């Protein structure tokens, strides 16, 4: 009996209304088709994603209602509605990840056309918590000196950046600890699970290339079964995909000492700092109208000056240790173990590389497959550091290597006009 009941429950779950299920990687379109006399049944609604010329067709039911789910966020989308004896209508829209766009059409007889009315609105009643949705255009026009998603997340008033720990800015949503957020890129979590970084990332800097973001959503305490393992909020990122047009970008950024002042309170200062990064992006069709790719690569290097150090170390703040005293310690240690206790002088260096690859395959009108691959490689010099009254020896430091690799598949299948499967 128990097995039979479980089977019934599983079977019933397949037919749960798609309007009650929120998708985290895709978007939906719904609406009605009507005339002045009532609903239009059997109307053909063709929905085309213009960048890839991918089309799906839906037929309105007895109440004139149609639904298309599992659609790629962004756009533009062209919706064409046609029915026997009625004038065809067109509408253009863009879609937001995890959202439902409502487009309703009021059609007129082909024999007498007075006015055509197309209305559109976004369904937001199913949103729980406070959400900020950010598209690629907003990202491109928002100033950012760090090329980090933190500059974009600040558009949500519940997001604050805290740099008290190790001088690294961390993301707090709704006042919660930075490590209690869930950062997801194309449905895969990129969190600091072991608590090794102050910024909450699994890497030294942003785990996603700034220019590869198609849409970003900041969700404050969303009450949904989709989300778990968070207390503050969820950051959902969808990356760009290829289209029928070849596109490419190159960007170079420099935030080194050439952009810093050379005086502080009237005194000359000499700071050596390197902070450079570059990004490459390229995408297009492998098979036109069917298979597409989009790849991005970025590399960044930062060399920060020592905050505290002995004379001759090039540090920002010189300790009360003379060069002669330091040399006495160095000579004594080298005579015992043959090592320089202070190690190299100058700057501490860290680097990071990000690689993303996305493939979109329109198998047919009913099945669409997306593959995402991401690599993050980085290293950073860690360990005890000198302070105003302490000189840290080089032996207390170590190189922290970081590597994160993820692969994910996302298959969307149209099982029926009102039944969508996402795996």
Annotate each predicted stretch with a short phrase.
Residues 78, 115-117, 182, 245-247, ...:
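Membrane-spanning beta-strand positions in outer-membrane beta-barrel proteins
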Residues 135, 198-202, 217-219, 261-266, ...:
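Extracytoplasmic loops and strand-loop junctions of Gram-negative outer membrane beta-barrel proteins
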Residues 61, 85-87, 91-104, 115-241, ...:
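Periplasmic N-terminal accessory/gating domains of Gram-negative outer-membrane beta-barrel systems
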Residues 50-53, 76, 80-91, 158, ...:
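A short, solvent-exposed loop/turn motif at the edges and junctions
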């Amino acid at each position: 009996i128990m097995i039979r009941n479980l089977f019934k429950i599983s079977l019933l779950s397949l037919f749960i209304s798609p309007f009650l299920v929120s998708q985290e990687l895709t978007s939906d379109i719904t609406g009605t088709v009507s005339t002045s006399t009532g609903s239009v049944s059997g109307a053909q609604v063709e929905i085309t994603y213009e960048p890839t010329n991918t089309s799906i067709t839906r037929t309105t039911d007895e109440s004139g209602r149609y639904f298309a789910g599992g659609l790629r966020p962004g756009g533009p989308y062209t919706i064409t509605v046609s029915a026997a004896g009625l004038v065809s209508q067109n509408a253009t829209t863009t879609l937001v990840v995890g959202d439902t766009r409502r487009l309703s059409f009021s059609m007129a007889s082909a024999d007498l056309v007075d006015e055509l009315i197309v209305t559109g609105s976004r369904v937001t009643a199913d949103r729980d918590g406070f959400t900020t949705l950010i598209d690629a255009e907003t990202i491109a026009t928002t100033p950012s000196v760090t090329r980090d998603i933190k500059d974009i997340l600040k558009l949500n008033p519940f997001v604050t950046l805290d740099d008290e720990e190790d001088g690294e800015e961390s993301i707090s949503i709704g006042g919660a600890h930075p490590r209690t957020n869930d950062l997801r890129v194309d449905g895969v979590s990129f969190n600091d699970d072991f608590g090794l970084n102050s910024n909450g990332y699994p890497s030294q800097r942003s785990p996603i290339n700034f220019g590869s973001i198609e849409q970003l959503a900041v969700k404050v305490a969303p009450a949904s079964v989709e989300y778990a393992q968070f207390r503050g909020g969820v950051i959902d990122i969808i990356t760009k995909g290829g289209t029928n047009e070849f596109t490419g970008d190159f960007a170079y950024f420099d935030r080194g000492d050439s952009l810093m002042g050379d005086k502080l309170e009237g005194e000359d200062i000499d700071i050596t700092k390197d902070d450079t990064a570059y990004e490459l992006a390229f995408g297009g069709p492998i098979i036109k109208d069917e298979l597409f790719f989009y790849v991005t690569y970025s590399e960044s290097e930062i060399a920060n000056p020592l905050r505290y150090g002995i004379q001759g170390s090039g540090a920002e703040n010189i300790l009360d240790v003379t060069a002669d005293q330091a040399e006495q310690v160095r000579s004594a240690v080298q005579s015992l173990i043959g090592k320089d206790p202070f190690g190299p002088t100058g700057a501490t260096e860290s680097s990071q590389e990000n690689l993303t690859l996305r493939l979109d395959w329109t198998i047919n009108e009913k099945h669409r497959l997306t593959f995402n691959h991401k690599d993050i490689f980085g290293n950073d010099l860690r360990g005890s550091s000198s302070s105003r009254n302490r000189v840290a020896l080089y032996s207390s430091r170590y190189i922290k290597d970081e590597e994160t690799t993820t692969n994910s598949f996302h298959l969307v299948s149209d099982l029926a006009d009102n039944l969508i499967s996402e795996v």
